[in-house]
């Protein structure tokens, strides 16, 4: 009986010293599956946190950030920048600059601009064709019916290249009629003697108007130069500067 009592007492002592199986943060089964080697884990893992098949963060199959299947940034399937499937293949590019239309580059010579190929002549601004009476009803009617075929701009050189108005007007009429005739004839239209006579009258009036306009502008430019070159004005400008 004594031997049986001692054996029973020894078994009870060993049970008290034996660690409990399982439990939180012990060597047994653990939940979630984070533990020391040898413990049972649920679910089976390869060394990462809960729901980490390959060692990444929550919901990371291959070690990237949240929602990153292969280690890129948010919404990056293969490691590129935002919205990039892989590398720089799908990067955003700036749109090409719109090409300038030829309509914006082409155009007639501007009023007062030097016309290339005419030896320094300039093209004046468009004018209304003057109402001219030629002394008989036939020519007056002919002019009214055909005036749209005649020039409404004149070619001229700067007024300071001429000694008087007559020289300016004579040169202006000749070059204008010549250019208009050549251009119009190239298009298949011919002028009669009556047309040439009427064009000379029309262009002469427009050349006189152009001379008066250019002379006034030239005089104003000269007056401005004289004003700003006077000693009092120069002294005032120097003081202001």
Curated annotation (Swiss-Prot):
UniProt disease annotation: PrP is found in high quantity in the brain of humans and animals infected with the degenerative neurological diseases kuru, Creutzfeldt-Jakob disease (CJD), Gerstmann-Straussler syndrome (GSS), scrapie, bovine spongiform encephalopathy (BSE), transmissible mink encephalopathy (TME), etc.
Entry binding sites for Cu(2+) 1: 54-56
Basic residues bias: start-end ranges: 91-101
Binding annotation for Cu(2+) 3: 70-72
Residue ranges the record marks as coiled coil: none
Function: Its primary physiological function is unclear. May play a role in neuronal development and synaptic plasticity. May be required for neuronal myelin sheath maintenance. May promote myelin homeostasis through acting as an agonist for ADGRG6 receptor. May play a role in iron uptake and iron homeostasis. Soluble oligomers are toxic to cultured neuroblastoma cells and induce apoptosis (in vitro). Association with GPC1 (via its heparan sulfate chains) targets PRNP to lipid rafts. Also provides Cu(2+) or Zn(2+) for the ascorbate-mediated GPC1 deaminase degradation of its heparan sulfate side chains.
UniProt region (5 X 8 AA tandem repeats of P-H-G-G-G-W-G-Q), positions on chain: 44-84
Lipidated residue numbers (GPI-anchor amidated serine): 223
Membrane topology recorded in Swiss-Prot or TrEMBL: Lipid-anchor; GPI-anchor
Organism: Mandrillus sphinx
Binding site for Cu(2+) 2: 62-64
Propiece residues: 224-241
GO biological process: one example: protein homooligomerization
Family note: Belongs to the prion family.
Entry keywords, A to Z: Amyloid, Cell membrane, Copper, Disulfide bond, Glycoprotein, Golgi apparatus, GPI-anchor, Lipoprotein, Membrane, Metal-binding, Prion, Repeat, Signal, Zinc
Record flagged with keyword Signal: yes
Interaction with GRB2, ERI3 and SYN1: annotated segments: 16-223
Residue spans of biased composition, Gly residues class: 45-88
One GO cellular component, as annotated: side of membrane
Signal peptide stretch: 1-15
Disulfide bonds: 172-207
The protein's name in its UniProt record: Major prion protein
Positions annotated with a glycan in the UniProt record: 174, 190
Assembly and interaction partners: Monomer and homodimer. Has a tendency to aggregate into amyloid fibrils containing a cross-beta spine, formed by a steric zipper of superposed beta-strands. Soluble oligomers may represent an intermediate stage on the path to fibril formation. Copper binding may promote oligomerization. Interacts with GRB2, APP, ERI3/PRNPIP and SYN1. Mislocalized cytosolically exposed PrP interacts with MGRN1; this interaction alters MGRN1 subcellular location and causes lysosomal enlargement. Interacts with APP. Interacts with KIAA1191. Interacts with ADGRG6.
Residue windows of the Sequence repeats: 44-52, 53-60, 61-68, 69-76, 77-84
Domain statement: The normal, monomeric form has a mainly alpha-helical structure. The disease-associated, protease-resistant form forms amyloid fibrils containing a cross-beta spine, formed by a steric zipper of superposed beta-strands. Disease mutations may favor intermolecular contacts via short beta strands, and may thereby trigger oligomerization. Contains an N-terminal region composed of octamer repeats. At low copper concentrations, the sidechains of His residues from three or four repeats contribute to the binding of a single copper ion. Alternatively, a copper ion can be bound by interaction with the sidechain and backbone amide nitrogen of a single His residue. The observed copper binding stoichiometry suggests that two repeat regions cooperate to stabilize the binding of a single copper ion. At higher copper concentrations, each octamer can bind one copper ion by interactions with the His sidechain and Gly backbone atoms.
Residue numbers spanned by region Interaction with ADGRG6: 16-31
């Amino acid at each position: 009986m004594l031997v049986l009592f001692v054996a029973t007492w020894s078994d009870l002592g060993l049970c008290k010293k034996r660690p409990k199986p399982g439990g939180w943060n012990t060597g047994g089964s653990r939940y979630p599956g984070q533990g020391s080697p040898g413990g049972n884990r649920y679910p089976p893992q390869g060394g990462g946190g809960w729901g980490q098949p390959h060692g990444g963060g929550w919901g990371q199959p291959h070690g990237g950030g949240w929602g990153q299947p292969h280690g890129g940034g948010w919404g990056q399937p293969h490691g590129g920048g935002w919205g990039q499937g892989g590398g720089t293949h799908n990067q955003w590019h700036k749109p090409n600059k719109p090409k300038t239309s030829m309509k914006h580059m082409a155009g007639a010579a501007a009023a007062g601009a030097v016309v290339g190929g005419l030896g320094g002549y300039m093209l004046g601004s468009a004018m209304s064709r003057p109402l001219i009476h030629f002394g008989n009803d036939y020519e007056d009617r002919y002019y009214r019916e055909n005036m749209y075929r005649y020039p409404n701009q004149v070619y001229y050189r700067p007024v300071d290249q001429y000694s008087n108005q007559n020289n300016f007007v004579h040169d202006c009429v000749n070059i204008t009629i010549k250019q208009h005739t050549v251009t119009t004839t190239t298009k298949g239209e011919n002028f009669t003697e009556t047309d040439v006579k009427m064009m000379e009258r029309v262009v002469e009036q427009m050349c006189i108007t152009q001379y008066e306009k250019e002379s006034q502008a030239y005089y104003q430019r000269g007056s401005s130069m004289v004003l700003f070159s006077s000693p009092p004005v120069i002294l005032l400008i120097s003081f202001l500067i």
